[in-house]
């Protein structure tokens, strides 16, 4: 299963970098993720005009989340859910101490607000990404859904990558 996770992580980097073919030796690629989207139609539409493979990270509790996700998908951009995590607030936010079934409900509701999400990244989330049990559950859930996770690395104590690698 470690090989499966490595494959999924490799696939993630290829998707985000927009690599359609093998990269020549020595050539570097950079992935760009713009987050906090879904709040302002004017600002959000400007991000769609950016050239190349730019990933749009959309917050589920914003007024234009669903519409912008559809627009971004139609424009050929990769869409991801910008999942609110502690200390973020709101109806979708994850906080330490919330039961897994409630975290699952919030994830399901957030994904419903951001159609075409190919994966998720954490909005804030320093305390949440340091929690082993929720991160282990999340990595397993994302694997079942064929979604990826990009850790915003808002904390040196994050266990997200370690839990993703432990999936067997």
Q: Which positions does each model-derived feature cover?
A:
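Hydrophobic h-region of N-terminal signal peptides that target proteins for export
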Residues: 13-22
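N-terminal secretory signal peptides that target proteins for export/translocation
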Residues: 1-5
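Catalytic-site microenvironment of enzymes
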Residues: 6-9, 22-168
